[in-house]
């Protein structure tokens, strides 16, 4: 009996800014969006806890090659925490480990918050996806195993108190990659001497993506249903919401090159481009229309070396053809 061939979906290239709902994992959200778009390949760029809502950039197709730049980008969050109760997960989904009275003034809270601004060291939560010997820490935590974790450097660019009412505080956080908001709240609670845990968490920004470009699952499913009812190919409407794949690397300096040099780059060769930066990653574009072809890095000899190349459709003409 022959195996039924598995349908792999269509080629989609670009980025959607999903407004992830609470109560599901980031991977669950990813799979739903992948199904809606009928996409062959997709990946998200930094997991949100099931409790958390907000911006979850999802990359399709060739855009997945540039997801690491979004993983490394700054993030912004809105978080509400409850003082006086500490949990093992540092959020409301965990088990309570201590209950203490709250006797904190706004001045004391302001002084405590100041300790967390700037460059600090943070110990990741045991209930995180960080790997130890190939397994995420949360698997050990669920088995009651405590793994020693080293503190890691992070940067809190801004930490603003938006509301303080009795046993609840609301904060806005602008932070570097690798920051765990649950750990931040847990550390704050311990510094205040009363304990604390996250009760609401929303990511409002990743890199420079505006939050008004986010779409939720309800809206995407609504578009899909309308297309089916009207006999319209879903891609005609869904793909209008895709952001260009190079939006993931807009923060990189652009190096524009003529087609003859781009032909060498697409074959994996480094090239010398006038006026290129002297170091770091660059966003490579071609010709007067600045067509995005990938991300390069400046070598020690000053040449632009390809690191991640876009491969869509036919190949570009080779260097010999361009030189004719």
UniProtKB/Swiss-Prot annotation:
Q: What is the lineage of its organism?
A: Bacteria, Pseudomonadati, Pseudomonadota, Gammaproteobacteria, Aeromonadales
Query: One Pfam family for this entry, by name?
Result: TruB_N
Q: Which PANTHER family match?
A: PSEUDOURIDYLATE SYNTHASE TRUB1 (PTHR13767:SF2), TRNA-PSEUDOURIDINE SYNTHASE (PTHR13767)
Keywords on record: Isomerase, tRNA processing
Q: Which family does it belong to?
A: Belongs to the pseudouridine synthase TruB family. Type 1 subfamily.
Q: Which InterPro entries match?
A: PsdUridine_synth_cat_dom_sf, PsdUridine_synth_N, PUA-like_sf, PUA_sf, tRNA_psdUridine_synth_TruB, tRNA_sdUridine_synth_fam1_C, TruB_C
| Catalytic activity from the UniProt record | uridine(55) in tRNA = pseudouridine(55) in tRNA
Keyword hit for Isomerase:
yes
The entry's active site is 49
Question: Which EC number(s) does UniProt give?
Answer: 5.4.99.25
Species assigned in the record: Tolumonas auensis (strain DSM 9187 / NBRC 110442 / TA 4)
Q: Which HAMAP family match?
A: TruB_bact (MF_01080)
A GO biological process of this protein is:
tRNA pseudouridine synthesis
**This chain belongs to which protein, by name?**
tRNA pseudouridine synthase B
The record's function comment reads:
Responsible for synthesis of pseudouridine from uracil-55 in the psi GC loop of transfer RNAs.
Q: Which gene encodes it?
A: truB
């Amino acid at each position: 009996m022959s195996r039924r061939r598995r349908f792999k979906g269509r080629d989609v290239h670009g980025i959607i800014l999903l407004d992830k709902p609470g109560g599901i994992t980031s991977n669950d959200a990813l799979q739903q969006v992948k199904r809606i778009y009928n996409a062959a390949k997709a990946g998200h760029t930094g997991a949100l806890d099931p409790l958390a809502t907000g911006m979850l950039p999802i990359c399709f197709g060739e855009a997945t090659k540039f997801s690491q730049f979004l993983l490394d980008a700054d993030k912004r969050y809105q978080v509400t925490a409850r003082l006086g109760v500490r949990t093992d997960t540092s959020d409301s989904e965990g088990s309570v480990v201590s209950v203490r009275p709250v006797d904190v003034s706004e001045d004391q809270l302001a002084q405590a918050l100041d300790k967390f601004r700037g460059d600090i060291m943070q110990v990741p939560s045991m209930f995180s996806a960080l790997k130890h010997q190939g397994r995420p820490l949360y698997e050990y935590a669920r088995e009651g195993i405590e793994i020693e974790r080293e503190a890691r450097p992070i940067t809190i660019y801004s930490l603003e108190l938006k509301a303080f009412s009795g046993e609840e505080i609301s904060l806005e956080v602008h932070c570097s990659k690798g920051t765990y908001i649950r750990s931040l709240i847990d550390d704050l609670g311990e510094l205040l001497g009363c304990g604390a845990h996250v009760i609401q968490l929303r990511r409002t920004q990743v890199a420079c993506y505006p939050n008004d470009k986010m779409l939720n699952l309800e809206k995407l499913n609504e578009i899909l249903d309308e297309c089916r009812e009207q006999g319209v190919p879903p891609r005609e409407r869904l793909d209008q919401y895709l952001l260009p794949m190079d939006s993931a690397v807009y923060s990189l300096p652009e190096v524009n090159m003529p087609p003859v040099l781009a032909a060498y780059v697409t074959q994996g060769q480094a090239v010398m481009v006038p006026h290129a930066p002297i170091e770091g990653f660059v966003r490579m574009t071609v010709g007067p229309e600045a067509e995005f072809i990938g991300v390069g890095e400046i070598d020690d000899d000053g040449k632009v070396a390809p690191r991640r190349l876009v491969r869509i459709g036919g190949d570009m003409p080779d260097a010999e053809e361009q030189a004719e």
